[in-house]
Curated annotation (Swiss-Prot):
<dbReference type="InterPro" id="IPR013962">
    <property type="entry name" value="DASH_Dam1"/>
</dbReference>
<dbReference type="GO" id="GO:0051315">
    <property type="term" value="P:attachment of mitotic spindle microtubules to kinetochore"/>
</dbReference>
<feature type="region of interest" description="Disordered">
    <location>
        <begin position="1"/>
        <end position="39"/>
    </location>
</feature>
<dbReference type="GO" id="GO:1990537">
    <property type="term" value="C:mitotic spindle polar microtubule"/>
</dbReference>
<dbReference type="GO" id="GO:0072686">
    <property type="term" value="C:mitotic spindle"/>
</dbReference>
<dbReference type="Pfam" id="PF08653">
    <property type="entry name" value="DASH_Dam1"/>
</dbReference>
<dbReference type="GO" id="GO:0044732">
    <property type="term" value="C:mitotic spindle pole body"/>
</dbReference>
<protein>
    <recommendedName>
        <fullName>DASH complex subunit DAM1</fullName>
    </recommendedName>
</protein>
<dbReference type="GO" id="GO:1990758">
    <property type="term" value="P:mitotic sister chromatid biorientation"/>
</dbReference>
<keyword id="KW-0963">Cytoplasm</keyword>
<keyword id="KW-0137">Centromere</keyword>
<dbReference type="GO" id="GO:0005737">
    <property type="term" value="C:cytoplasm"/>
</dbReference>
<keyword id="KW-0206">Cytoskeleton</keyword>
<keyword id="KW-0158">Chromosome</keyword>
<comment type="subunit">
    <text>Component of the DASH complex consisting of ASK1, DAD1, DAD2, DAD3, DAD4, DAM1, DUO1, HSK3, SPC19 and SPC34, with a stoichiometry of one copy of each subunit per complex. Multiple DASH complexes oligomerize to form a ring that encircles spindle microtubules and organizes the rod-like NDC80 complexes of the outer kinetochore. DASH complex oligomerization strengthens microtubule attachments. On cytoplasmic microtubules, DASH complexes appear to form patches instead of rings.</text>
</comment>
<keyword id="KW-0539">Nucleus</keyword>
<keyword id="KW-0159">Chromosome partition</keyword>
Amino acid sequence: MAPEDTNPQSSHRRTRSTSRSRPTTPLRPSSRSSFRSSARGSVYGDNAAFPLNAFEPAFAELADAVADLEANMMHFQLMHESLARFSESFASFLYGLNMNAFCVDFPEGPITESFKRMKLKEEEMQASSQIPSAWRGDPPISTPTAIYPRTDIRILIVKSGGYTWWKRRASWGSG
């Protein structure tokens, strides 16, 4: 066994560090003394009938800590099961959205029926308000307004009833 250092200055130097990376936390009362010192006291005349009785408080504390750990792990298990159920349900929802995207055609712009519905709605609004279209300030449906020579894509801008539609067309014929 190595001799213990009884110099108070050396132990004082060790505990007094000026560059601590994190704050220190005081130890719990049972952790301040080691098992060795408690066993030494019982062996060398602590008036105990059985020397291992000195470990009884430490083992009781260990049993309590293990019971707390078991309860916390049970809570973790419940949380894991809840998250797994949610993840499975959410994955099913995303899969349904993905399959819906494959089964339903989403056009990039309005289709012919959209223009027909808009025209009917506009006629209904005009009939109900009896205001001439020239007074409303809506421009008529325009012709292709932009030509991109490198990509040969033309854009049709349609203003009708407060909505603006952009439609990409790859070919318009001669325009």
